[in-house]
Swiss-Prot record:
An example Gene Ontology molecular-function term: structural constituent of ribosome
Region (Disordered): 121-140
UniProt entry keywords in alphabetical sequence: Ribonucleoprotein, Ribosomal protein
Keyword flag Signal: no
Gene Ontology BP, a term: translation
Organism lineage string: Bacteria, Pseudomonadati, Chlorobiota, Chlorobiia, Chlorobiales
Organism: Pelodictyon phaeoclathratiforme (strain DSM 5477 / BU-1)
Family membership: Belongs to the bacterial ribosomal protein bL17 family.
PROSITE patterns assigned to the protein according to its UniProt record, in alphabetical order: RIBOSOMAL_L17
Pfam family, one: Ribosomal_L17
Entries under PANTHER family matching the protein: LARGE RIBOSOMAL SUBUNIT PROTEIN BL17M (PTHR14413:SF16), RIBOSOMAL PROTEIN L17 (PTHR14413)
Quaternary data: Part of the 50S ribosomal subunit. Contacts protein L32.
Annotated GO CC locations: cytosolic large ribosomal subunit
Name of the protein in its database record: Large ribosomal subunit protein bL17
HAMAP family, alphabetized: Ribosomal_bL17
Amino acid sequence: MRKVKPARKLGRTAAHRKATLSNLSTQLLVYKRIETTEAKAKETRRVVEKIITKARKGTVHAQREIFKDIRDKQAIRILFEEIVAKVGTRQGGYTRVIKLAPRFGDAAKMAVIELVDYQEAPSASQKTGKQDRAKRVKGSKKTAEAAVSVAG
């Protein structure tokens, strides 16, 4: 009797799905945090958790096994030099999926997937970025009106 495998197909062929998950995994290892759809984030979490667990072994065989999934030498280097050192003795749960608001164009469920040990608090410039921009826009509007009134 046919049994259903517990993986999401993501509406793709097997080769396309493998390539998509490989690319998402590579980007997650390089950038530590990516925004994607919720289904892709959850599938990427399954792949990345297994990759990091293999990497913790640190053997040549583990490197070769990981290189099957991630064909990027920079991502492999980051994985073995930075991420494995950072996760230390953590027994799993290396990633976190945070749900976001739906995407504007098609209302797809969006999520952020990030590595747990790479939380960075937003800097002061990031926190006030929108406020500064609003002030500049308001200020530029006033200066534009003043220039029109002087010219007119």
